[in-house]
């Protein structure tokens, strides 16, 4: 989903201020606004590492470093909510190897 759609999502617990996400226009369509999370980084094995931007009771929300949209994944079960680990990116941004969701809110 795009950032504008995410901002309208109800019943989410934000981990970061959405104003801290860097917005940019999609190269293929300047009317589409995408975003980057400055906390994301590419590790030495070639995997993107991303951090949650929000949660709801069942899901974790992250900014996809491949397409610039917000993706959601299962949060896991209480009490641990083990959402971290490798995930497929679920986007059509060409061939990519997904990303690793990290626990925490690192800057």
Protein language model annotation of sequence segments:
Residues 1-37:
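Glycine- and charge-rich intrinsically disordered segments
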Residues 69-75, 96-100:
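Short functional micro-motifs and their immediate structural scaffolds
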Residues 51-59, 80-85:
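Short, flexible, mixed-charge glycine/proline-rich loop motifs
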Residues 27, 37-53, 73-76:
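Short Cys/His-rich Zn2+-coordinating modules
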Residues 80-107:
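Short metal-binding segments enriched for Cys and/or His
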């Amino acid at each position: 989903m795009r950032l504008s759609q995410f901002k309208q999502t109800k019943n989410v617990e934000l981990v970061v201020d959405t104003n801290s996400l860097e917005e940019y226009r999609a190269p293929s369509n300047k009317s589409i606004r995408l975003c980057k999370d400055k906390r994301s980084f590419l590790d030495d094995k070639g995997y993107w590492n991303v951090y949650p931007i929000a949660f709801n009771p069942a899901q974790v929300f992250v900014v996809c470093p491949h397409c610039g949209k917000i993706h959601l994944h299962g949060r896991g079960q209480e009490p641990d909510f083990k959402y971290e680990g490798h995930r497929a990116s679920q986007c059509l941004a060409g061939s990519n190897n997904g990303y690793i969701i990290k626990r925490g809110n690192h800057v």
